[in-house]
Amino acid sequence: MASKGGKAIGIDLGTTYSCVGVWQNDRVEIIANDQGNRTTPSYFAFTDTSRLIGDAKNQVAMNPSNTVFDAKRLIGRRFNHPSVQSDMKLWPLQVIPGPGEKPMIVVNYKGESKQFAAEEISSMVLIKMLEIAEAFLGHSVNDAVVTVPAYFNDSQRQATKDTGVIAGLNVMRIINEPNCAQIAYGLDKKSSNPPEQNVLIFDLGGGTFDVSLLTIEEGIYEVKAPKSDTHLGGEDFDNRLVNRFVTEFLTNNKKDIRWECEALRRLRTACERAKRTLSSSTAQTTIEIDSLYEGVDFYTTITRARFEELNMDLFKKCMDPVEKCLRDSKIDKAQVHEVVLVGGSTRIPKVQQLLQDFFNGKELCKSINPDEAVAYGAAVQAAILSGEGNERSDLLLLDVTPLSLGLETAGGVMTVLIPRNTTIPTKKEQIFSTYSDNQPGVLIQVYEGERARTRDNKLLGKLLGKFELTGIPPAPRGVPQINVVFDIDANGILNVFAEDKTAGVKNKITITNDNGRLSKDEIEKLVKEAEKYKAEDEEVKKKVEAKNALENYAYNMRNTIKDDKIPGKLDAGDKEKIETAVNEAIEWLEKNQLAEVDELEDKLKELEGLCNPIIARLYQGRGDVPIGGPGDMPGGGYGGSRGSSGAGPKIEEVD
């Protein structure tokens, strides 16, 4: 929701550089900063007298321990996260664990030691982008659309929204970076009015990498399957050069500069410059640093071939998400009409060559500015949300959720409510019930992943990712109707609601805590494991379903024969037969927890063969034989017995 008055802006909050745009005079204006540059370094420096934003990058070598960069790599992460620990080895910054294991950046400011969370640092960058926009527009700005990598999890998205709040902004929407690039591409091509197109966005920036396949048709932008690495980009390519030259300096001069902040930062700046030079037409460049450490100068040369060799595994790593994106989208590479390059790191010739080779020599689309495309799309989205960009109101962006979301039901089964690649925002609900007679409450545990068993998936949010619904009135198992709702908003943030429809008891949770969701590595690992163990998962799932079907049928029969509202009376002999058979089945289940699927199914058929004819005769007395299985019978709740075809809702049980 936009605030009253003023324009809304779009901000690309990047790992290394940020950019801001606004919709004005029927077009997007990418706004230059006070130095005349259309992108601003995402750097923040603290001195004895002031704070420097953006321009801080120019004095980083003189003040390395107090110049903060790469803050985006800390957003929404915990201190002990592997990527945080890995990055800390390369930073001249001091990072310590804060409350709740939140990484805190330590700097000296005005003679005092201060600690800042990544959200605070990023908010300072946002404030700078806000000031740039306000200086250009001549009035205050309250509303903004802010971009994030496609695979940012719930806690990272919420942390980004918090960053906006700290900066005094109303964050109208958190939007995925490749989707913004897609909007920029779509508007660039709109004048030619192309038919339906499959467009692959290849977004390789300073710290993150996103791939998305989108279909454009008549102003509708539908995301098919996003893939991402939230820890891969130009900074990592720089690190390879830095490590190479640290080793070279040690070999030639017997001096180790790995822990020397000033020397390391000067070397890193030179390496970034060399990378940019090698990405242009130059095949070789030199690095010259006077008095790098203890009066020793450093001079070396680096060729493009050597640079490519040092980073080849990372370059090839960029192709894996492309392949997975196409596979999940069920689209062949030959069906991709355009491959759009976004992000400064796509200027690297070897990256372009590998991508072109992957698509069998297809010409890559370079018509949009890779540094500005994301901010461009964000500005368009901001205009639409604020009601300003009426000319673009026919543009509809359909995003998706990257992994399946569900909860744990009886037997540790992952019951999926929202499958992966579902278009968001979305809202799905399902009826569940109790597992035991007179059960006073249920535990709702939210999971994310593709495995059949919840123990193989990731519990979302740990302590905040589960909640209890208590106060359920005493009733036989399977009778209470518990409505569970999963609601994902347009920002990709999940809310879970649960309500006992009989008693009116309610509870809810928003999965936004600092424990976070899945990192890219965890996602890739889970998907690989899911592929590897798919057959095993299916077998386990079948066993649990067969066991639950037998158990549900047995308890439903027990409840049915005890129900005094049953029309007609059971013959005493028939009632005893059912009681005996049910007790034997339950006892057999308790003794055979590891029974195979066929054994469980045979036992169920045996029990059905005895009970069904008796129950059918009971209902035939009134001429209203129930349709479907015993899950539809009186007293049985909605057990969801195998083979049931009743029209009632399918209800699964929650421990």
From Swiss-Prot:
Claim: Zinc is one of the keywords in the record: no
Pfam families given in the database record: HSP70 (PF00012)
InterPro entries for this protein: ATPase_NBD (IPR043129), Heat_shock_70_CS (IPR018181), HSP70_C_sf (IPR029048), HSP70_peptide-bd_sf (IPR029047), Hsp_70_fam (IPR013126)
Ranges annotated as biased composition (Gly residues): 626-646
Region annotation Disordered: where it falls in the sequence: 622-655
Keywords: ATP-binding, Nucleotide-binding, Stress response
SUPFAM superfamilies per the UniProt record, alphabetical: Actin-like ATPase domain, Heat shock protein 70kD (HSP70), C-terminal subdomain, Heat shock protein 70kD (HSP70), peptide-binding domain
GO MF assignments: ATP binding; ATP-dependent protein folding chaperone
NCBIfam families named in the record: PRK00290.1
Family: Belongs to the heat shock protein 70 family.
Name of the molecule in the record: Heat shock 70 kDa protein
Gene: HSP70
